[in-house]
Amino acid sequence: MRTECFLQPDGSYDWDKQQGQRNFLRLAKERGVNKFLAFLNSPPVYFTQNGLATNTGRDGTLNLKAEHYEDFARFLANVIKGVEKKDCIKFDYLSPFNEPDGHWNWIGPKQEGTPATKKEIARAVRLISKEFVKEGIDTEITICEASDYRCMFSTHMTNHERGYEIQSFFCPDSVDTYLGNTPNVPHLITGHSYWTNTPLKS
């Protein structure tokens, strides 16, 4: 069974979807949580290259058709606004990619994630930023939820199209991928600590 999506095949939005996740958000807010981050593992299947929300082995490229990058940005803006309007939950952060550098995600549909190259990430983030500015959304776009801290400053188990993320996204010399002056993109980078927090002697 596929995960529910607010966006429907006819282009309309069904705000009765994803009740379980939204209930968790409301319960968290009631209990004092005051910062919220939205994330996703895939663009809507209507926009993907394979019609699925999982990778099917494109050598780690983004599962998003070239003609749907702007549609993807518009979808994210609509969801950010829609959840705030319907549930009074304001997302402080949006993480549009999950472990894009994960080498395990290049082969096939073995685990959720958003395989992508840094150029694909930069293109998408610039368009998301543009849409957020147009719609007056101040949610910050975080990048890039690395699968391993080491991918941020090396090519650990990945390659140059995906590694060295700090340098690539925040050094002005990285012309194709620089996001340091992009509206709504804070000067921070996110990642997961798998394999780097144990054993302690490492």
Predicted regions and their residues:
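N-terminal catalytic cores of secreted or lumenal carbohydrate-active enzymes
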Residues: 1-92, 104, 112-117, 122, ...
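Structural preference for beta-strand elements that scaffold enzyme active sites
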Residues: 33-37, 44, 90-95, 138-142, ...
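Solvent-exposed loop/turn segments at secondary-structure junctions
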Residues: 42-46, 97-103, 146-150, 193-197
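Noncatalytic carbohydrate-binding groove/subsite architecture in carbohydrate-active enzymes
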Residues: 69, 81, 111-202
